[in-house]
Regions:
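Short glycine-centered helix-capping/turn motifs at secondary-structure transition points
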Residues: 92-93, 169, 254, 296, ...
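Short, well-ordered beta-strand core segments
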Residues: 136, 299, 383-386
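Switch/coupling sub-region of P-loop NTPases
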Residues: 189-202, 208-213, 242, 248-313, ...
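Alpha-helical scaffold elements adjacent to nucleotide-binding pockets in ATP/GTP-utilizing enzyme cores
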Residues: 47, 51, 84-87, 123-127, ...
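Short beta-strand elements
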Residues: 18-24, 279, 383-386
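Peripheral, non-AAA+ core regions of ATP-driven protein-machinery
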Residues: 1-215, 219-225, 327, 466-467, ...
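Walker A/P-loop
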Residues: 216-255
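Basic, amphipathic alpha-helical bundle interface domains used for macromolecular binding and assembly
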Residues: 37-45, 58-60, 67-77, 286, ...
Length: 505
C-alpha cells in the first residue's frame, strides 16, 4: 500500500517542502528511509516505531520503505519524524489518506509519542505557505512562532495519539491562536548616562545614521563598552520585513523562544576565543554564525587584537558584501550579514599608550606587534576610527547630563529618511550600502571639498576603498546636518575619523 504526505526541513535559512512517500509491501520486516537522509533522519526510524507502538497503534510487520523527495536535497534534523509517522499510519490503513491532503506536519517524536518542537519552524511554515499549504500540525511549543506567518491555520496537538484521534473525528481540536504581542520594553541604558566623550558619541551618531563601522581605541575604563552597548538605542526601529528576517535567522539557529516577532535590533558580543565557524557559521549544513545573528543589528568585538588574526580576516567578505558565503561538498550557502561593526581595543598591550596620567610600559616592538594583529585590509573596511580617552573627574561628577538617546535617535531617523528617499531607486536604505554608481550620482563634492580630499588622499596614500568610505561618511554627516550638499566641513570631519592605530611619538 502506498501513501504520501508533506513535511519540511530547513536548508540553510530557508525551508524546503519535502514529500514523504511511504510504501508497505509483503516482504521480510524492514524499515528503510531513502532520499539522501542525514544521520539524524535515519535515527527517526527508532523514534517513529516506538512512538506509534506506545501510542496504541500497530506498526506494520512488513517491509516499510520511506522516500524523501526531492532525493538530491540532503535532509537533516528530526523535523520529519511526525510526517513519516503519519504516512506510515495512513499507508497501513489506521487513518484515511484523504484527511492528510494539503496539510503539513512538523515535529520530532519522543519514544512515548509526544510531539516535540524543532528549530526553524518559521522558515518551514513560510515554505509551506509558498507551496500553497495553509494548514499545519506541530508542537504547542512552536505554534506561536508559526502564527507569525499570515493566512495560516495551525493545530497544536500534544501527542501523536491526540493528533490521530482528531483526524479520525473522535475528538475536537481548536486551532491555535496568536497571543497578544507584549509591549516593547524600554531600554535600560541611555546615552545620557555617558559623561563627556563628545567625539566618541558623535562617531556613534554618525555610525547609526549611515550604518558605518567604528573602531574605538582607548585605555581600560575609558567607556568603550559603555558606548557600544548604547548604539542600539539610537538605531531606527526595524521594519516588519527586517524583523521577520531576523526572527527567521534566530528560529533556524534555535535561539527564538518568544511568542512574538523579534522587534529589537540584535546586539551580538562574542568572546575573543570564538572560532572561525562560530563567527561566520559552520557545520555540515551550516548554522548561522555571529555575523548572521547580528544581521540588521550590531556586532561588537571587544578587545579586537585578542581575536585570532585568522578569525578576524574572515570578516572582510561580510563587511564588504553584507553577506557570507559558505561552501560545502553538496551545496553552497549564502547567509545575510548586514550589520554595524563596533570594535574596541587598547592602544597597546599595557593599555596606556598616549595616556597622560599612566606611563606606557610597552616597548616599541611590543606596540608594533600589537598593531600588526589587525590587518590593513580589515582596518580599511572600518569607516570611523575614534580615540576614547578616560573622562576627567569634572566630567564624571558633572550634574548636567549628556544628550539623551531619544534626542540623538530623532536626528538619526531624519538622516535615514533622507537616505531612504535618495536611494529608493536602487532599493537601498542607508549610505553604507552605496556602490560606485550611487556615489557618483548622489555624492558630488564642490571644488573646495574635492581639493581638500585630494590633498589628504595623496599625503596619506589612501586606497580607493578608503576614498569611497570617506565620501560615504561625508554624505552621512551632511544628512545629519539636513543638507543635500556635501560641504568642505563635512569632508573635514569625515577625514578626522580616518586615524590609524596610535604610535609612540
Amino acid at each position: 500500500m502506498f501513501a504520501q504526505v508533506f513535511g519540511t526541513c530547513t536548508f540553510g535559512l530557508n525551508g524546503h517542502v519535502i514529500t514523504v512517500e511511504v510504501d508497505i509491501s509483503r516482504a521480510s520486516p524492514a524499515f528503510d528511509i531513502v532520499g539522501l537522509p542525514a544521520v539524524s533522519v535515519k535515527e527517526s526510524k527508532e523514534r517513529v516505531q516506538s512512538a506509534i507502538r506506545n501510542s496504541g497503534y500497530f506498526f506494520p510487520i512488513e517491509k516499510v520503505t520511506v522516500n524523501l523527495a526531492p532525493a538530491d536535497l540532503k535532509k537533516d534534523g528530526s523535523c520529519l519524524d511526525l510526517p513519516i509517522a503519519m504516512w506510515v499510519l495512513a499507508a497501513s490503513g489506521v487513518i484515511p489518506k484523504e484527511v492528510l491532503a494539503s496539510v503539513m506536519f512538523i515535529g520530532e517524536l519522543s519514544l512515548q509519542g509526544e510531539i516535540r518542537s524543532v528549530p526553524g519552524v518559521l522558515s518551514m511554515v513560510l515554505a509551506g505557505r509558498e507551496a500553497g499549504i495553509s494548514t499545519f500540525f506541530m508542537s504547542p511549543a512552536v505554534a506561536g512562532e508559526a502564527l507569525l506567518c499570515e493566512n495560516v491555520t495551525v493545530y497544536a496537538p500534544r501527542t501523536l495519539g491526540e493528533l490521530v484521534e482528531y483526524l479520525l473525528g473522535h475528538s475536537p481540536m481548536a486551532p491555535a491562536k496568536r497571543r497578544e504581542a507584549a509591549e516593547s520594553k524600554l531600554s535600560d541604558v541611555d546615552f545620557a548616562e555617558v559623561q563627556g566623550q563628545i567625539m566618541a558619541k558623535r562617531a556613534m551618531e554618525i555610525a547609526a545614521a549611515g550604518s558605518h563601522n567604528v573602531l574605538m581605541t582607548g585605555p581600560p575604563g575609558s567607556g568603550k563598552t559603555m558606548l557600544a552597548r548604547r548604539i542600539t538605542t539610537i538605531l531606527p526601529p526595524m521594519t516588519r520585513e527586517e524583523a521577520l528576517e531576523v526572527t527567521k535567522i534566530y528560529s533556524v539557529a534555535g535561539l527564538f523562544k518568544a511568542e512574538d516577532i523579534i522587534r529589537e535590533r540584535p546586539f551580538r558580543s562574542p568572546h575573543h576565543t570564538i572560532s572561525m565557524a562560530g563567527l561566520i557559521g559552520g557545520g555540515t549544513i551550516p548554522r548561522p554564525g555571529e555575523v548572521t545573528l547580528a544581521h540588521n543589528g550590531v556586532l561588537f568585538l571587544d578587545e579586537l587584537p585578542e581575536f585570532p588574526r585568522a578569525v578576524l580576516e574572515v570578516l572582510r567578505q561580510p563587511l564588504e558584501d553584507r553577506e557570507v558565503h559558505i561552501s560545502r561538498v553538496n551545496a553552497s550557502f549564502v547567509y545575510p550579514s548586514d550589520f554595524v561593526l563596533i570594535a574596541a581595543m587598547n592602544p597597546c598591550p599595557c593599555g596606556y599608550l598616549g595616556d597622560p596620567d599612566h606611563p606606557c610600559t610597552c616597548s616599541d616592538g611590543e606596540i608594533r606587534s600589537y598593531g600588526r594583529k589587525i590587518s590593513g585590509p580589515l582596518l580599511d573596511r572600518i569607516d570611523l576610527h575614534v580615540s576614547v580617552m578616560r573622562p576627567k573627574y569634572s566630567e564624571l561628577t558633572a550634574t548636567i547630563k549628556g544628550e539623551s538617546s531619544a534626542r540623538i535617535a530623532e536626528r538619526v531617523a531624519a538622516a535615514r529618511a533622507m537616505q531612504s528617499e535618495r536611494l529608493s531607486e536602487w532599493h537601498m536604505q542607508n549610505n553604507a550600502q552605496m556602490g560606485h554608481r550611487q556615489l557618483r550620482e548622489t555624492c558630488r563634492l564642490n571644488a573646495e571639498g574635492s581639493e581638500l580630499l585630494r590633498e589628504v588622499f595623496e599625503k596619506l596614500h589612501l586606497s580607493a576603498r578608503s576614498y569611497d568610505r570617506i565620501i560615504k561618511v561625508s554624505r552621512t554627516i551632511a544628512d545629519l546636518a539636513g543638507t543635500s550638499e556635501i560641504k568642505p566641513e563635512h569632508v573635514a570631519e569625515a577625514l578626522s575619523y580616518r586615524n590609524m592605530l596610535p604610535r609612540r611619538s
